[in-house]
């Protein structure tokens, strides 16, 4: 049912946009070398425009993705890097202009940073929104092109979904994105984990699923998230920036996190993802506003400065 709803939602989002496209690796980088242990120093309190009591970011974590480490205790238990009351905000399946921008505005009002796992079709269809995410200081990871269950696909097709999404997102963002990946439906396989490890791409599951795809009303969504968070005490929170009620709930959710003493941790990568030339070539035409072989959107090359648009 979730797959049907998501396919319909992404399909609807693309109307009017151009067609755009449990075991981890044997060895992991040492957490103490990745700057992601609980002992990592807190971020100095930053001023937040027009909000002296902003939630802000308590800690920035840099992840060394060598070997493709896995995070999120629902699937991967190698790294317990969060302190009590620390939360990582993550969003899947976007960007979608209206809802993603509403979420970005709420995050900006509280000077909070998040990680967005983008779907290639929407990243390519709305590169301006993806660049807004990047400009806001958030981290961009990938989530395939069309959101299939990769565990059910032949290896080469699954590999293409991963690599094309990396190429599209990097092209749309204007620079290589983070080597962070989340499996659609959180369905991995040993073969795909091994492949991602060979590509030095970290894999993210979750500690707390908001189940916002079931479309609870904003107040109910906030109550569910806070209740589960209070039980767990900390965690990587999974949400979706294509969900209207998630966008509506975001300002109050951030207030609830602050009121209950939770702190935000921002995930960053030690180095950006390395795209593969083969897939860069295959996806040249899959980003709106880009000519083949051009790394700049048309709007950044030709701009009307007087007269009618």
Predicted regions and their residues:
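Active-site beta->alpha N-cap acidic-glycine motif
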Residues: 50-157, 161-170, 177-178, 272
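Acidic helix-start/capping segments at beta-turn-to-alpha-helix junctions
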Residues: 124-125, 183, 189, 272-276
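Terminal accessory/targeting
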Residues: 1-88, 105-110, 114, 233-309
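Structural recognition of the beta-strand scaffold that forms the well-ordered cores
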Residues: 87-90, 114-118, 139-142, 179-183, ...
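Alpha-helical scaffold elements lining the catalytic groove of polysaccharide deacetylases
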Residues: 99, 148-173, 187-233, 246-249
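Short low-complexity, flexible loop/linker segments enriched in glycine and/or proline
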Residues: 130-133, 156-158, 219-222, 279-283
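Surface-exposed helix-capping loop/turn segments at secondary-structure junctions
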Residues: 171-177, 261-264
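Active-site beta-loop-alpha junctions enriched in small/polar residues
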Residues: 94, 119-121, 145, 184-186, ...
């Amino acid at each position: 049912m979730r797959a049907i709803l998501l396919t319909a939602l992404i399909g609807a989002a693309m109307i009017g946009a151009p067609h755009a496209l449990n075991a981890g690796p044997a060895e992991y980088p040492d957490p103490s070398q990745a700057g992601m242990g609980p002992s990592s120093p807190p971020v100095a309190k930053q001023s937040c425009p027009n909000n002296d009591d902003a939630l802000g970011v308590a800690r920035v974590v840099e992840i060394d993705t060598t070997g493709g480490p896995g995070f999120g205790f629902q699937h991967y238990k190698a790294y317990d890097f969060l302190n009590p009351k620390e939360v990582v905000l993550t969003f899947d399946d976007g960007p979608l202009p209206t809802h993603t921008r509403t979420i970005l505005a709420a995050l900006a009002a509280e000077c909070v940073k998040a990680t967005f796992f983008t779907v290639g079709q929407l990243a390519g269809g709305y590169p301006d929104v993806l660049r807004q995410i990047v400009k806001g200081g958030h981290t961009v990871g990938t989530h395939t092109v069309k959101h299939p269950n990769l565990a059910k696909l032949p290896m080469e097709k699954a590999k293409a979904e991963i690599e094309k999404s990396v190429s599209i997102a990097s092209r749309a963002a204007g620079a290589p994105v983070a080597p962070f990946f989340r499996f659609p439906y959180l369905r991995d396989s040993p073969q795909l984990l091994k492949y991602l490890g060979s590509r030095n791409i970290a894999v993210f599951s979750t500690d707390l699923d908001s189940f916002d795809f079931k479309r609870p009303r904003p107040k109910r969504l906030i109550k569910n998230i806070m209740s589960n968070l209070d039980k767990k005490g900390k965690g990587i929170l999974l949400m979706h920036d294509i969900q209207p009620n998630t966008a509506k709930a975001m300002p109050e959710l951030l207030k609830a996190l602050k009121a209950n003493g939770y702190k935000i941790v921002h995930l960053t990568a030690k180095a950006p993802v390395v795209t593969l030339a083969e897939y860069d070539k295959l996806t040249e035409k899959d980003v709106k506003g880009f000519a083949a072989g051009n790394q700049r959107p048309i709007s950044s090359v030709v701009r009307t400065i007087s007269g009618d648009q």
